[in-house]
A protein has these predicted regions:
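Extreme N-terminal starter segment of soluble prokaryotic enzymes
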Residues: 6-11
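Short internal beta-strands
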Residues: 36-40, 225-232, 268-274
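C-terminal functional extensions of proteins
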Residues: 2, 239-313
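Redox- and metal-dependent alpha/beta enzyme cores, enriched for Fe-S-associated oxidoreductases
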Residues: 210-249
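Active-site glycine-rich loop that binds ribose-phosphate moieties when present
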Residues: 170-189
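Electropositive, gly/pro-rich neighborhoods at or near active sites that engage anionic ligands
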Residues: 2-3, 39-175
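Short Gly/Thr/Asp-enriched flexible loops that form oxyanion-binding sites at enzyme active sites
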Residues: 23-27, 206-219, 283
Length: 313
């Protein structure tokens, strides 16, 4: 596939699966040095004594062509360690494959030796053969916490993985965000970007944690063009709780809610072609709306959407 000559550097704000697929599409059509992916770390956690960075790893595995069939994990991974842990009486409800564990072991060892998360990420990305730049939003501890309607505060992993995001959400917080600093290179990449994309990730759970890091939202707002891709189709998420969480937090239904989630941030919003009626219905906003086929599970579809988005600029 021929590379598209971009008019300048590109930044993508990304969560997990949806963002990873959009990153894959952009990487397929851009020169490698043109793309920086800034990734959510709000769902980082400690599991089995290891520092896990699920969104960073999902993006890295997808860009490397090694993602598992659901869109996360490593394709063809084995689970021997999980079997051994289970035999020792360890709770293994949080399933991590052996190859995935190796990445988490390498990351944790480096962090404990004083290396920053961004430095570890750059090194692991190089080991996986990535050509574009992959950065965490922050090197500092920032954790998404979900307050359920039943009154419990849950870590993101407890809410999303162990409890299957079935709980009704009452509130979302980003612990540590106020004291967090953007990772080295993040603000510089955004300031240099001719175009910032917001991936079709869950706004409150994947993109808001990035924007909660002081300085990042202001940097994005100052960018000449900020284009988001809606994560909704007919008002619903294809998978995951984006629509339910947005509603629980008081955002309007459908793409009006996506606009509200990114109020004051966007120049453009791309909705799915099946929601083309929203282009006219929501045209009274200052944001330009566009309709396209935004289903990007397949590689070719992700590249097609990437070319469309770049042509908008």
């Amino acid at each position: 596939m021929r590379e598209r000559q971009s008019s300048g550097p590109i930044v993508l704000l990304s969560g997990g699966v949806g963002g990873a697929r959009m990153a894959r599409g952009l990487a397929a059509v851009l020169p490698p040095a043109a793309l920086t992916v800034v990734v959510n770390v709000g769902d980082d956690d400690e599991i089995y004594g290891l520092h896990i960075s699920p969104d960073l790893d999902t993006v890295a595995y997808t860009l490397a062509g090694r993602e598992g069939p659901p869109g996360w994990g490593v394709a063809g991974d084995t689970f021997a360690v999980m079997g051994h842990l289970g035999a020792l009486g360890v709770d293994t409800n949080f399933r991590v494959g052996d190859a995935d564990l190796a990445v988490n072991l390498a990351r944790t060892a480096a962090l404990r030796c004083g290396e920053s998360l961004s430095a570890v990420t750059v090194r692991l990305a190089a080991a996986l053969g990535l050509a574009c730049r992959l950065l965490p939003a922050t090197d500092d501890c920032l954790r998404t916490r979900v307050h359920t309607a039943a009154g419990e505060w849950l870590s993101f992993q407890d809410y999303f993985v162990l409890r299957g995001h079935r709980d009704e959400v009452a509130e979302v917080r980003y612990e540590g965000a106020g004291a967090a600093r953007p990772a080295p290179g993040v603000l510089e990449a955004i300031a240099a970007a001719s175009l910032v994309f917001v991936a079709p990730s869950n706004p409150p759970l994947s993109i808001w944690p990035i924007l909660a890091v002081p300085g990042i939202r202001d940097a994005v707002t100052a960018a000449p063009r900020v284009i988001a891709v809606s994560p909704l189709f007919g008002g619903r998420a294809l998978k995951g709780p984006a629509d339910r969480v947005m509603a629980a937090l008081g955002l309007p239904p459908g793409n009006a809610g996506v606009l509200a989630a990114y109020d004051g941030l966007l120049t453009d919003l791309v909705v799915d072609q099946d929601d083309a009626a929203d282009v006219a219905a929501l045209s009274r906003t200052a944001v330009r709306l566009h309709a396209a086929d935004t289903r990007i599970a397949a590689r070719d579809d992700a590249a097609r959407l990437a070319r469309y988005l770049l042509d908008l600029s």
